From Swiss-Prot:
UniProt keyword annotations, A-Z: Methylation, Ribonucleoprotein, Ribosomal protein, RNA-binding, rRNA-binding
Similarity comment: Belongs to the universal ribosomal protein uL3 family.
Chain positions with N5-methylglutamine modification: 151
Protein name as it appears in the record: Large ribosomal subunit protein uL3
Gene of this entry: rplC
UniProt source species: Bartonella henselae (strain ATCC 49882 / DSM 28221 / CCUG 30454 / Houston 1)
């Protein structure tokens, strides 16, 4: 089990595939995503990595977090989150994960917080049909109707759909396809919509219901390995200068 990543939602756009069809995608950005702490079986009873992403001003960071980031020798982060991993996929502190962590065609599970809608009625919140528009009905056109039975059981059961706060809840969308990645700009393009507003922090993990592609990097797509791969592909040019030549 590999680590997930923390990405920032930039918005939606569309790209064209080889068949000329446009594909709606959500653009997620990885910005300085580094490991800031480890969790081991010997010390914590489980194996995990704590990731930090983004940049935060020192004056806006608490004293406790300043010491936490200083211990890891990383800059203060805007967002931190923890991901369970298997012991063989444990990453060293300070390791930076890039967009190469995911490969095109891979399925991922995306977790975000939906946009808050405020207080909403049952017709908007739960898609109720409402009451009659006329024929003796007044005031209760959009009411939810009965909330339960009679003296027995004499209560409203938990989970009864009523009016209330809509949105602003944590939602995980499973099996979203990774359309493409841009390692240089740290972008991950996933098919379709992702819960959350623009600028929201999104957690992206390998799909638990789909197999991991064979070409997915293990233990992770880290910055150093990505740099070495680029150097291997780039042509090598040799230049020599003779000092003091006349």
């Amino acid at each position: 089990m590999r680590s997930g990543v923390i990405a920032q939602k930039l918005g939606m756009t569309r790209i064209y595939n080889d068949a000329g069809e446009h594909v709606p995608v959500t653009v997620l950005r990885l910005e300085n995503c580094q490991v800031v702490a480890q969790r081991t079986v010997e010390k914590n009873g489980y194996t995990a990595v704590q990731l930090g992403v983004g940049f935060a001003k020192v004056k806006n960071t608490s004293q406790a977090l300043r010491g936490h980031f200083a211990k890891a020798s990383v800059e203060p982060k805007a967002k931190i989150a923890e991901f369970r991993v298997s012991p063989d996929n444990l990453l060293d502190i300070g390791t930076e994960i890039t967009a190469e962590h995911f490969v095109p065609g891979q399925r991922v599970d995306v977790t975000g917080t939906t946009i808050g809608k405020g207080f909403a009625g049952v017709m908007k919140r739960h898609n109720f049909g409402g009451h009659r528009a006329s024929h003796g009905n007044s005031i209760t056109h959009r009411a939810h109707g009965s909330t339960g039975q009679c003296q027995d059981p004499g209560k409203v059961f938990k989970g009864k759909k009523m009016a209330g706060h809509m949105g602003q809840v944590r939602v995980t969308t499973q099996n979203i396809e990774v359309v493409s990645t841009d390692v240089e700009r740290g972008l991950i393009l996933v098919r379709g919509a992702v819960s959350g507003s623009k600028g929201a922090w999104i957690l992206v993990r390998d799909a638990i219901k789909k197999p991991l592609p064979d070409n997915a990097p293990k233990p992770a797509g880290i910055r150093q390995l990505a740099k070495e791969k680029t150097e291997m592909v780039a042509p090598v040019t040799e230049t020599s200068e003779v000092e003091g030549a006349e």
